[in-house]
Amino acid sequence: MPTYQRRRRLWPNLYLTPVEASRNDEGMRRFRVSVGAVVGAVLLGVASAPPGVAQTPWFEATVGNATQVLSVVSTGGSTAKMDVWQRGPTGWEPVGTGIGVHVGANGMAPQAHDGNMATPMGVYSLDFAFGTKPNPGGGLTYVQTTPDYWWSSQGPTYNTMQVCKKADCTFDTSPASGTENLYIPQYAHAIVMGVNKERIPGNGAAFFVHTTDGGPTAGCVALDDDTLVKIIRWLQPGAVIAIAQ
């Protein structure tokens, strides 16, 4: 929502399995996960926690069994900070911190609503990824879009991805309708946030984590494309985004 197979990894060694010959060597396994977190943060160019130091993040009680979390906390206005977290054998560890992101032009709001230009607070699933660019890899389903891809804000298809020629679409594709064409620069890469999964009209549609154009969004979370690609490569099914002021 702009203003107007081998497991791929975000950072090498982030996901590590115990060496088969040393399955009971818990110390070695924890060491490797910790090293992976530090290496990941270095590659991203951001700060990380000391090796092996588990922390208690603000969202811990709200994300259930999730092991990957994108934490987005407001820094005022339409800007926020994203931290990338992984739950390991010793608890939660940040694998990337202090990533600057843009949120809604009106900041954040307790609940999503069409047209309020605010990013909804809460915890949301990260359902699948899409973009105008080829699939960068990762654990999420990825859809490469063309000019025939839309996110509908109308009728029975409200808050769903649709594929149709503009002249053949059964929903209003005009910008005034709220429907979005998904073949635009801000959607070079994007991740679908599970906002309003019940698809109740008026309760919000088309909330994504997507490539930034350098300005505030209509309610999405936007960041630089290089970092977003790394995140997409790292994400696995079950990951969530947690948003707060």
Segments predicted by a language model, with ranges:
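Secretory targeting and sorting signals
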Residues: Y15, E20, N24-A54
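Charge-dense polyanion-binding interfaces
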Residues: A242-Q245
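Cell wall/extracellular polymer interaction/catalysis modules
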Residues: Q55-T217, L228-V240
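Conserved "landmark" site that anchors the functional core of diverse proteins
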Residues: D224
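Low-complexity, intrinsically disordered or signal/transmembrane-proximal segments
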Residues: Y4-Q5, Y15
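Short cysteine clusters
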Residues: C220
